[in-house]
UniProtKB/Swiss-Prot annotation:
Function: Allows the formation of correctly charged Asn-tRNA(Asn) or Gln-tRNA(Gln) through the transamidation of misacylated Asp-tRNA(Asn) or Glu-tRNA(Gln) in organisms which lack either or both of asparaginyl-tRNA or glutaminyl-tRNA synthetases. The reaction takes place in the presence of glutamine and ATP through an activated phospho-Asp-tRNA(Asn) or phospho-Glu-tRNA(Gln).
GO biological process, one term: glutaminyl-tRNAGln biosynthesis via transamidation
UniProt keyword terms in alphabetical order: ATP-binding, Ligase, Nucleotide-binding, Protein biosynthesis
Taxonomic superkingdom: Archaea
PROSITE patterns referenced in this protein's UniProt entry, alphabetically: GATB
Name the UniProt record assigns to this protein: Aspartyl/glutamyl-tRNA(Asn/Gln) amidotransferase subunit B
The EC number(s) this enzyme carries: 6.3.5.-
Assembly and interaction partners: Heterotrimer of A, B and C subunits.
Membership in a protein family: Belongs to the GatB/GatE family. GatB subfamily.
């Protein structure tokens, strides 16, 4: 299987690409954020290209390791007929970035476009609020070899876009997915709007094309639609070539110059890309790559980790934030930014653990109460009665009592049933009201049984 992606992502700007209409099209009443320019009415001339859109397009190109086409860049008219395109053409730039790479997938080019309106065939209505919203199209080489690789690439791309702050995120992303298998023609699946959708569409299309090949049926070069509700693809039309779009330079828009100074300005404000941050975390803090990937899955979480790692052992902080904090965030369906958990609260909790003021189990219970809780970890511990760790002699006494009261579990453990040891640990924790250290308890149990 060979797969290439064409990913359309809306850029984060306050106004449209060639006019001053606002870009909050989702909240606005239908056909209210419009003007003669974004409707392409006769005589209406486009404004100069939105500077913020150019800056964001450059930033994303650089974060995806692209070379920048310095000098003059111009817009073309891409002609096609559809109800959401009143002019009959879409303005699309020549590539701004080219020859990039992400996650082992080569990026052929990145160029700017204007978004068309929103056509709803089932109702026969068109909302032009979206018309003219700035887009970039990210075009990859056909380097993706499986649906799983496509899913991984798109997840990593979304992470880069979130870090950049210059894109509107997965909810506005649309992907055209091109797939071919050996002996067949290329098939394009249009306007898939989620990572899950791209993965499911590729899985279905791969099976469909293999079945056609087995039956000796030709795989047509065509455009297909992915029906998310049924998780299938259906034919739309024969695939267009570039000549079908009749590209011509747009005479209403002067070329825009991309200078060295402009690129330097973008580099100064550009955040560190997540894949670069992963590499730096492993080198600077000595944590493993998998932990670094988890900690950089959100920009705010990565920033928090760095702040914590300056005050607490970085590896200890990594372990707790990777496992326990992410577990709690996932359970509550929260991003770190929305959790209300402060850096100083994480530091306080980890210091309590390091100073043996609380047990590991107590720490796990405390962190479960931390999201959107104005209490400090110490206050939570006091409220739940979790402060304090019992002394070794108290643990030894509890261990001996657990052994005496549970001879069957002891015999089962000696006969090879390792799970019985967990039962005995639980009994010791009960006797010490959860204030014994689980690791130390296991050690003392083994010494007394074996």
């Amino acid at each position: 299987m060979m797969c290439g992606l064409e990913i359309h992502v809306q850029l984060e700007t306050e106004s449209k690409l060639f006019c001053d209409c606002p870009t909050n099209y989702k909240e606005a009443p239908a056909n209210s954020n419009i003007c003669p320019v974004c409707l392409n009415q006769p005589g209406a001339k486009p404004y100069p290209t939105n500077e913020k859109a150019i800056e964001n397009a450059l930033m994303i190109s650089l974060m995806l390791n692209c070379k920048i086409d310095k000098g003059f860049t111009y817009f073309m008219r891409k002609h096609y007929d559809y109800p959401d395109l009143p002019s009959g053409y879409q303005r699309t730039s020549v590539p701004i970035g080219y020859e990039g790479e992400l996650n082992g997938v080569r990026i052929r080019e990145i160029h700017m476009e204007e978004d068309p309106g929103q056509y709803k065939p089932d109702r026969g209505t068109v909302d032009f609020n979206r018309s003219g919203i700035p887009l970039i199209e990210i075009v990859t080489e056909p380097d993706i070899k499986s649906p799983e690789e496509a899913r991984t690439f798109l997840k990593e791309l979304i992470r880069v876009l979130q870090y950049s702050g210059g894109a509107r995120g997965e909810g506005t992303m649309r992907a055209d997915v091109n797939i071919s298998i050996e002996g067949g023609n290329r098939v394009e699946m249009k306007n898939i709007n989620s990572i899950k959708g791209a993965y499911k569409a590729l899985k279905f299309e791969l099976v469909r094309q293999k079945n056609l090949m087995k039956r000796g049926v030709e795989i047509k070069q065509e455009t297909r639609a992915y029906l998310e509700s049924q998780m299938i693809t259906v034919g739309m039309r024969l695939k267009e070539d570039a000549d079908d779009y009749r590209f011509i330079p747009d005479p209403d828009l002067p070329p825009m110059e991309i200078s060295d100074a402009q690129i330097e300005n973008v580099l100064e404000i550009m955040p560190e890309a997540p894949h670069n941050k992963v590499r730096r975390f492993t080198e600077e803090y000595g944590i493993d790559a998998e932990s670094a990937k988890v900690l950089t899955s959100e920009l705010d979480l990565a920033i928090a980790y760095e702040a914590v790692a300056k005050q607490v052992d970085p590896k200890f902080a990594s372990m707790w934030m990777r496992d326990e904090l992410k577990r709690v965030l996932s359970y509550n369906k929260l991003d770190f930014a929305d959790s209300g958990i402060l850096v100083e609260d994480i530091v306080e909790l980890l210091e309590m653990l390091q100073n043996k003021e609380i047990t590991t189990k107590a720490g796990q219970r405390i962190i479960e109460h931390m999201p959107n809780n104005k209490q400090t970890p110490k206050a939570i511990a006091e409220e739940l009665g979790l402060l304090g760790v019992v002394k070794d002699d108290e643990v030894i006494a509890a261990v001996k009592q657990a052994i005496e009261e549970n001879p069957k579990a002891v015999n089962d453990y000696l006969e090879g049933q390792k799970s019985s040891l967990n039962f005995l640990v639980g009994q010791v924790m009960r006797l010490t009201r959860g204030k014994a250290d689980p690791g130390e308890t296991v050690k003392i149990l083994k010494e007394n049984i074996e």
